[in-house]
UniProtKB/Swiss-Prot annotation:
Residues 226-283 are annotated as: Disordered. One of its GO terms (biological process) is cellulose catabolic process. It holds the Pfam family Cellulase. Residues 280-747 are annotated as: Catalytic. Residues 227-281 have a biased composition (Low complexity). SUPFAM superfamilies: (Trans)glycosidases (SSF51445), Carbohydrate-binding domain (SSF49384), Type X cellulose binding domain, CBDX (SSF57615). Disulfide bonds join 39-133, 183-214, 193-208. It is an enzyme of class 3 (hydrolase). Residues 1-37 form the signal peptide. Belongs to the glycosyl hydrolase 5 (cellulase A) family. Residues 38-136 form the CBM2 domain. The gene is celC. This is Endoglucanase C. Keywords: Carbohydrate metabolism, Cellulose degradation, Disulfide bond, Glycosidase, Hydrolase, Polysaccharide degradation, Signal.
């Protein structure tokens, strides 16, 4: 067989780093409705140390409520953040309406949500007080169904009919919407714009739709009036309990219907988030709420996330028997054709999804290349593939679509990452039209340089013999194509698009302008998606055809160098012109197994100050992982955006916990032989602690173990030095990484 060398995800001289996520368990939790009728306190999720909850206010009178204020108090529980209301006090708490949700028509419901900690106690259900909490009737909870009702709307749900991945509450007001000043956009409520005359706008810190655009929809959609009428929702038409009440326009349930005061729901009509809904088939509303947290259909979306790669292309060795120096696009699956006397390991993608879900995963980042979208590209088809025939794809495009659909069936959310301009150029690109020389051009003893490939049609050096021309127009076309997959495949799990991986070669001004165009392109096709924006680097313009004219980029302290994709230092003062509830910042950050940064140097070795990478190795510099120093850099580079209310989802973090020992390259073992402690594991622990404390979500790189500088969550017998012939084989989960991730997620 042709031996396949592991694709090094990045040359160790590349500048990258990453983070982690504070996850929320999805256990189905019964709620308690106390307080006077008209107000409900609903526990929507709970885990060991915390919970999420909502307060729902139903107007059960015959008069319009203009403005509301409610209060509640705990014994030991405390609120840590709140969205869609103004919060005051500190146990007791008070919450009042925002400008857009203060008016409640008779028979209608509004809600706001919050997250809290139990402080070693149990999850409480306190009484809610306020003038709006009078009149009507309260709800009841049975042993196998969860139903709430008010005097103005009624619902009937049979036992065992609630199956939801995000909430345990189904309210009878699911078919009632707030009327006036809103647009029912194909089943989803948005505010009507005041000053925007056509298309979509952004006013009062929220997305809105112009009256002319809203009115152009076919019936029954359009501008929502003040009247109400009964509606009947058929079996399997309501997607999860997020449809149980009217939610904010920017995060409303896609299963809301224009207006009603009563509804009938059959025994199978409340289903998981992967089911169909009244909205456009295959779509789900993904938003970032005012607290910077991810939501789906108005409910908090747990983001226990990992990377699963391969479809973006790998690097084959120059002596491969079938595909020398090729770049096949094939998801790693732990089942290579030559294993077990060519019978394969038996592992399937479904098996891996099942195992990942059992470990807590709710979300996956899926890297691709532009060529992945081409079903006819030979690098996505046999005979250039290595997976066992039992799981082998027909082509890379089909594999992409099949993976998305299978993840949807497993209630795993997906976001697609355009990982490079070319499956051959790979991680090196840094820009759409990247040209060599690349960062690994002079790497000693390395078989996988790609100096003969360029993504630019012009101004290439003499080393280039193969051009995969890529530019902004092709990129925007790819974004539109990906945005259309939700409708094409009939799925509701495509969160958004990570528009380009590690754009380290742009200045912030350049990258900001590009992502604004990316937003417009995506939004034209799919207004339900998020736009996921990575950071830049500390320098720009090295891959633009002028490698000697690198431009320094502001990133805060020069002693704290950002990795590729980490630098969002300028984003707070000069953010992209993208609605805040559609924008998700996604920096990358890594420890020493990927690149030894200057901030890792032992301050006791003054001769090592400012050194990094190979220079630090040659000087035999010691590595000291100081969380205080690391956090200063993270705060400058992206952490401060959390306090500004932006959503942050770290796109990549992770590493080889045994570096520079087991599983490391021979070059790293030689260069860093004086390092005998678990410095990369220490770095990962510091990162996980920081992100958990900040409430920042993150995606671990990677689930599969074929990344040469990080390995994976899955263990492998492969070792590039002692067991190179075991490449592509998986065993169980690395218990150290399991503990790291479970601690970070609160599991």
């Amino acid at each position: 067989m042709g031996h396949v060398t592991s694709p090094s995800k990045r040359y160790p001289a590349s500048f990258k780093r990453a983070g982690s996520i504070l996850g929320v368990s999805i256990a189905l939790a019964a709620f308690s409705n106390v307080a006077a009728a008209g107000c409900e306190y609903v526990v929507t999720n709970s885990w060991g140390s915390g919970f999420t909850a909502a307060i729902r206010i139903t107007n059960s009178t015959s008069s319009v409520i203009n403005g509301w204020n409610v209060s509640w108090q705990y014994n030991s529980n405390r609120v840590t953040n709140l969205w869609n209301a103004n919060l005051s006090g500190s146990n007791p708490y008070s919450a009042s309406n925002l400008s857009w949700n203060g008016t409640i028509q008779p028979g209608q419901t509004v809600e706001f949500g919050f997250q809290g900690v139990t402080n070693s106690g149990t999850v409480e259900s306190p009484t809610v007080n306020g003038a709006a909490c009078t009149g009507g009737t309260s709800s009841s909870v049975s042993s196998s169904s969860v139903v709430s009702s008010s005097s103005s709307s009624r619902s009937s749900v049979s036992s065992s009919s609630v199956v939801s991945s995000s909430s345990s509450v189904v309210s009878s007001s699911s078919s009632s919407v707030v009327s006036g000043g809103q647009c029912n956009w194909y089943g989803t409520l948005y505010p009507l714009c005041v000053s925007t005359t056509s298309g979509w706008g952004y006013e009062n810190n929220r997305s809105c739709i112009s009256p002319s655009t809203c009115s152009a929809q076919p019936a029954p959609y359009g501008i929502v009036g003040g009247s109400s009428s009964p509606s009947s929702i058929s079996s399997s038409s309501v997607r999860s309990s997020s449809s149980s009440s009217v939610v904010p326009p920017s995060s409303s349930s896609s299963s809301s219907v224009p207006s009603s005061s009563s509804s009938s729901v059959s025994s199978s009509s409340v289903v998981s988030s992967s089911s169909s809904s009244v909205s456009v088939p295959g779509t789900g509303v993904f938003r970032v709420n005012t607290q910077g947290n991810l939501t789906k259909d108005g409910q908090l979306l747990p983001a226990r996330c990992g990377n699963w790669f391969g479809l973006e292309g790998r690097h084959e060795p120059s002596n491969d028997a079938d595909n020398p120096s090729g770049a096949p696009m094939e998801l790693y699956a732990g089942n290579m054709w030559w294993v077990n006397n060519s019978q394969g390991s038996g592992r399937t993608i479904q098996q891996t999804m099942t195992e990942l879900k059992q470990q807590g995963i709710t979300m996956l980042r899926l890297p691709i290349a532009p060529q992945t979208l081409d079903a006819n590209d030979p690098q996505g088809r046999s005979p250039n593939l290595k997976n066992h025939q039992s799981i082998r794809q027909s082509n890379a495009r089909q594999a992409l679509e099949d993976f998305i659909k299978l993840a949807d069936q497993n209630d795993i959310q997906i976001f697609i990452d355009i990982h490079s301009c070319s499956n051959y150029v790979g991680w090196r690109a840094g820009r759409l039209d990247a040209r060599p020389p690349y960062v690994d051009a002079n790497r000693v003893g390395y078989d996988f340089t790609r100096e003969e490939y360029s993504c630019s049609a012009t101004n290439n050096p003499s080393s280039v013999t193969r051009i995969h021309a890529y530019d902004k127009q092709k990129w925007l076309a790819n974004l539109r194509e990906i945005a259309g997959l939700s409708a094409k495949l009939g799925v509701s799990n495509l969160i958004g698009i990570d528009v380009f991986n590690e754009p380290y070669d742009y200045t912030w001004a350049e990258w900001k302008g590009m992502v604004e165009e990316a937003y417009q392109a995506i939004n034209e096709v799919n207004p339900n998606m998020l736009i996921i924006v990575e950071g830049i680097s500390a320098n720009a313009n090295t891959q633009d055809g002028t490698p000697d004219t690198s431009v320094p980029v502001p990133h805060g302290s020069t002693d704290l160098n950002p990795n590729w994709g980490e630098n969002l230092y300028e984003a707070g003062a000069n953010p992209p012109n993208i609605p805040k509830d559609r924008l998700l910042f996604s920096p990358h950050t890594y420890g020493p197994s990927v690149f030894v940064q200057r901030q890792f140097m032992d301050p006791a070795q003054t001769e090592c100050a400012g050194l990094e990478g190979d220079e630090a190795a040659q000087a035999r510099c010691r590595i000291v992982i100081n969380p205080t120093v690391l956090e200063q850099g993270w705060e400058e580079h992206f952490g401060y955006l959390r306090e500004l209310g932006y959503g942050i989802l770290i796109g990549e973090f992770g590493g080889n916990m045994d570096w520079p020992g087991a599983k490391s390259s021979q070059a790293d073992r030689n260069a860093w032989s004086h390092i005998t402690t678990n410095v990369d594991q220490q770095w990962q622990q510091a990162a996980a602690s920081y992100f958990k404390r900040k409430g920042i979500n993150a995606c671990y790189w990677s689930m599969n173990p074929e990344s040469a500088d990080t390995m994976g969550w899955y263990l492998t017998p492969w070792d590039p030095v002692t067991a190179n012939d075991m490449w592509g084989q998986w065993t169980g989960f690395d218990p150290r990484k399991t503990q790291l991730l479970h601690n970070m997620w609160g599991l």
